């Protein structure tokens, strides 16, 4: 087996945990955004002793988190280069891509022009057209849908267009065909959504249930990522949480679904107990979905503290030749205006038991530096973007 600096690299993306406005925040209407800083203020101090040990407060002062005199990890921050601040853009950039055209989000629903085209091409009416929880919108509009056959169209804070239909009203093959039409229409730059999702359900009013026949029509990454290179070289790429959806299954050797952040940490612990060579890639989405978009700083703070409390289990299972990297994909400051993501730096923590000490890493000008470091470690084809910091980890 080749002599890799690290046999296993565990990447943990704390979805939306930004660490202060990016230099180009003004272009995104995000001046003053500071996800971690503002949560810490609202909580009157965050209790994250394990992240403190890793050096989190050395990146930026955070209320309640002391700057440990001798941090155990290398620490720094990364700036997003791509033109966007959504989950797909952040993750694709982490794995070596540069995204010029941002994916669209529709916090006020989709434009009439798009929906009229969809109606015309499907022969069905449309109801809903707003951001909503998938179960709540069925309670609200399921009965009307059953009477009229109109499609329930809704979105979320992410770049998605979801179409819900009762399996006895709109047969599955028709719903899938409708979603394929929607996918085609939204390849137009002005409607460019990351995913179309078919959301079939069954049951009666008051007792609707979504079925397992969900189908995603995602965009595949437009170029090869570091994950493709690892997989082609026979290495393991273990996706945990929504990672597989984000990359539309590209470059992934196995995928573990998660129900929550804590379930994600359980799956990470399980993965730490297995023998593999390659990467494990975990996304913890609750920070973003449950607290950031809902502008709930206290809930967000508690979730951060719960995450921190799970880290000793991870530390205990790390081997000498493992590397743990903790970062984020964008910000989502819960005290910022609106409900959207925020353009921020993201933290970068790199920890291994074999590190002699720790030090500050230079600020990365692109998230792709992380992907380049992974590629460098596994001696595979380097991405077009990004500069490896592997040699700095000693």
From Swiss-Prot:
GO terms for cellular component: cytosol. Its cofactor is Mn(2+). It is an enzyme of class 5 (isomerase). Gene3D superfamilies: Alkaline Phosphatase, subunit A, Phosphopentomutase. Keywords: Cytoplasm, Isomerase, Manganese, Metal-binding. CDD domains: PPM. One of its GO terms (biological process) is nucleotide metabolic process. Mn(2+) 1 binds at residues 15, 329-330. Binds 2 manganese ions. It catalyses: 2-deoxy-alpha-D-ribose 1-phosphate = 2-deoxy-D-ribose 5-phosphate; alpha-D-ribose 1-phosphate = D-ribose 5-phosphate. SUPFAM superfamilies: Alkaline phosphatase-like, DeoB insert domain-like. It is found in: Cytoplasm. Its EC number is 5.4.2.7. The keyword Cytoplasm applies. It holds the Pfam family Metalloenzyme. InterPro entries: Alkaline_phosphatase_core_sf, DeoB, Metalloenzyme, Phosphopentomutase_DeoB_cap_sf. Mn(2+) 2 binds at residues 288, 293, 341. NCBIfam families: deoB, PRK05362.1. HAMAP family: Phosphopentomut (MF_00740). Isomerase that catalyzes the conversion of deoxy-ribose 1-phosphate (dRib-1-P) and ribose 1-phosphate (Rib-1-P) to deoxy-ribose 5-phosphate (dRib-5-P) and ribose 5-phosphate (Rib-5-P), respectively. Belongs to the phosphopentomutase family. This is Phosphopentomutase.
């Amino acid at each position: 087996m080749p002599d890799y600096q690290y046999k296993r690299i565990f990447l943990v993306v704390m979805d939306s945990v930004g660490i202060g406005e990016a230099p180009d925040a003004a272009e995104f209407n995000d001046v003053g955004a500071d996800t971690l800083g503002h949560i810490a203020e609202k909580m009157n101090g965050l209790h994250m002793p394990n992240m403190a040990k890793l050096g989190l407060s050395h990146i930026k002062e955070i209320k309640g988190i002391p700057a440990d005199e001798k941090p155990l990890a290398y620490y720094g921050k990364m700036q997003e280069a791509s033109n966007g601040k959504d989950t797909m853009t952040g993750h694709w950039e982490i794995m070596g891509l540069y995204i010029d055209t941002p994916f669209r989000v529709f916090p006020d629903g989709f434009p009439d022009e798009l929906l009229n085209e969809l109606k015309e091409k499907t022969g069905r009416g449309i109801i809903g057209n707003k951001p909503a929880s998938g179960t709540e919108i069925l309670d609200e509009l399921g009965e009307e849908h059953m009477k009229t056959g109109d499609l329930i169209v809704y979105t979320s804070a992410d770049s998605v267009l979801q179409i819900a239909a009762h399996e006895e009203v709109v047969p599955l093959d028709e719903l899938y065909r409708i979603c394929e039409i929607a996918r085609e229409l939204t390849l137009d730059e002005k409607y460019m959504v990351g995913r179309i999702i078919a959301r079939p359900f069954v049951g009666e009013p008051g007792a609707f249930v979504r079925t397992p026949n969900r189908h995603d029509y995602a965009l595949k990454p437009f170029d090869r990522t570091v994950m493709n290179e690892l997989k082609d070289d026979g290495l393991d790429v273990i996706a945990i949480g929504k990672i597989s959806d984000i990359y539309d299954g590209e470059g992934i050797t196995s995928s573990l679904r998660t129900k929550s952040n804590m379930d994600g940490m359980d799956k990470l612990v399980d993965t730490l107990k297995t023998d593999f060579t390659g990467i494990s890639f975990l996304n913890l989405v609750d920070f973003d979905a449950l607290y950031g978009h809902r502008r709930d700083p206290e809930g967000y703070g508690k979730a951060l503290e719960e995450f921190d409390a799970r880290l000793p289990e991870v530390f205990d299972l790390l081997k000498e030749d493992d590397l743990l990297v903790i970062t984020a994909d964008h910000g989502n400051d819960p005290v910022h205006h609106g409900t959207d993501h925020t353009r921020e730096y993201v933290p970068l923590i790199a920890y291994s038991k074999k590190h002699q000490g720790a030090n500050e890493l230079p600020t990365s000008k692109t998230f792709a530096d992380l992907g380049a470091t992974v590629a460098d470690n596994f001696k595979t084809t380097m991405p077009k973007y990004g500069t490896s910091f592997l040699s700095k980890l000693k």
